[in-house]
C-alpha cells in the first residue's frame, strides 16, 4: 500500500463522544472513495469472535479439508501447470439467517458451533442495521430509510458465507476468489487476523485489506451504489492465494428481500437518475451468471429487460 494511502479504520466507540463528527466524516469518506472500511469497538464480544474463529477452523479440518482436496483432484488442480481463471481456490459453506434459518439443516456442524453462529448472526444483523442508519445520516436520508427499502414485503435476506482459503503451492496460477463486486447491500466480514489475502481495487492498484484482530471489515454492495445514485460505490475485490497459512473468512451479507424495489433515493437525484429501478430478485438472477464480469453492463441491462439475456447468465450464486 502506498505511504499516503491509509486504509480507513473506524472506531465506533467514538460515535458516543466529542469525536462523533470526525468519525461520521471518516465513514462517509470511506464509502465515497473506498467502498470499504474496517471497524473496531463494534460491540461484538471478543470471546464470541474467538469461539467462531476456532470452531470455523476446526470444522474445516474435520469436515471440509478432505472434500477440498478431493475437489482439487477431480478438477485437476492438485498439480497446477497453467493459470486457471474459472475456478476459485476456496472451501465454503453457507448459513442462511433470514428470512428463515437453515442452521439446523447443516448436518456436519456441531450443536455448539450452531449455537455460536446463531448468536453471532443475530448480533451482526443488528450491527448491519445500525451501520445502515449511519449511512442514512451521512446521506441526509431519514433514519431507517435503507432498512425500509431492503425490507420489501418479506423482510431482508441475511446470510453468512463461511470460507477457508488453504495454502496454495502456486499462488500465481489461481486466485482464492476472483475479482468481483458484491451484488447485495452491506457486507460484514470477520477475517483471519494472521493470514492475509483480501485485496480491493483502488485507483488502478490492488490494495491489501489489512488483517486486524477482532475487527470487522465492511464493504458496500451494488444495491447501495444504486440507491445512493452513485454517491457510494461497490468496489472490485478479490482474494489472492498464499503459499503458507489457511485463511479464514466469515462474510455476512445483509441484503434486500427478494421482492424489494430498488431505485435511487429521490433526494439523491439532482437531474436524471444514473441508475435503473428494479426488483432485487431480478438483479440476482442476472448476477448469478455474470458475477465475475463488470457491474456496469449489469446496471445497463436492468434498464432494458431484453438486454438481460444478452449477458447470458448461466452460473449459480448463493443468494441466501
Swiss-Prot record:
Residues involved in Fe cation binding: 180, 182, 237
Annotated keywords: Coiled coil, Copper, Ethylene biosynthesis, Iron, Metal-binding, Oxidoreductase, Plant defense, Vitamin C
InterPro entries with a match to the protein in the record: DIOX_N (IPR026992), IPNS-like_FE2OG_OXY (IPR044861), IPNS-like_sf (IPR027443), Oxoglu/Fe-dep_dioxygenase_dom (IPR005123), Plant_2OG-oxidoreductases (IPR050295)
Top-level enzyme category: oxidoreductase
Catalyses which reaction(s): 1-aminocyclopropane-1-carboxylate + L-ascorbate + O2 = ethene + L-dehydroascorbate + hydrogen cyanide + CO2 + 2 H2O
Knockout or disruption consequences: Impaired in the 1-aminocyclopropane-1-carboxylic acid (ACC)-mediated reversion of the ABA-induced inhibition of seed germination.
One Gene Ontology term, aspect cellular component: plasmodesma
Expression induction: Upon iron deprivation. Induced by ethylene, particularly in root tips and hooks of ethiolated seedlings. Promoted by ozone O(3). Accumulates in response to very-long-chain fatty acids (VLCFAs C20:0 to C30:0). Induced in roots by nitric oxide (NO).
Pathway: Alkene biosynthesis; ethylene biosynthesis via S-adenosyl-L-methionine; ethylene from S-adenosyl-L-methionine: step 2/2
Binding site for 2-oxoglutarate: 247
GO molecular function per UniProt: 1-aminocyclopropane-1-carboxylate oxidase activity; copper ion binding; L-ascorbic acid binding
Cofactor: record remark: Binds 1 Fe(2+) ion per subunit. Can also bind Cu(2+) ions.
Domain Fe2OG dioxygenase: 156-256
Descriptive protein name: 1-aminocyclopropane-1-carboxylate oxidase 2
Lineage: Eukaryota, Viridiplantae, Streptophyta, Embryophyta, Tracheophyta
Gene label: ACO2
